[in-house]
Amino acid sequence: MALPTELRQALRELAAHTEGIDLPVYQAFERDPLEPIIGLGDTDAPLCFFGRDPGREEVRHGEPFIGSGGQIVRRVLYRHLHGAEMPDFEAGRALGRHYFWINTVPYKPIGNKAWSMAVKRRFQPLMRQLLIDSWHGRHIITLGREAFLWFAIGQPREARQRLEAFWQREDRFTANLDIDLQDAQGHARTFTLHPLPHPSPLNQTWFKRFPALLEARLRQLDASR
């Protein structure tokens, strides 16, 4: 599905007044630095992947979750769906339409450092609206602490504390948590978060375990349907 016109324009206007977008990378690939990188997939996709922010390869292709971390996710998904190894880049890319892909901020930051809380707060109402209005699913696999705790932004104190406490649990990568989101118009929905670590080689504690953790999540979700 296409990004709703009003939402796309609102994101572009917000990006135009946001410092820290990695302009040289966008220029190197002749990409518009105001164009949000969001992989909407099917509105009825049963599963959403929620990450931190796009990287260099995401800018190159204009799609989220297509770089090294995203390739790990896609390889596990392909193997789970087809029982075979992903044959090539395009096969992984084709998986995109079967899922909903979104980040805390849909623009690449300079140096691939996480966006500040101020920037995440600025974009949060629009990304929240996208989740509530443009996707009909419930289950969200969050990748990393930044993505998981995005769901605490703008929440009542009790909900924030519940999210923060959940992240401290030893079983956080096998358990799940329901969270309510409400947009500016008062439309509310309940989502179920299934957190996983960020699939980055820099995250040595969890990097090697990530494929097995994601496969376990996918099996859990298959069993719950």
Regions found by a protein language model. Give the residues of each.
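A polyanion-binding, active-site-adjacent surface
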Residues: 2-173, 179-224
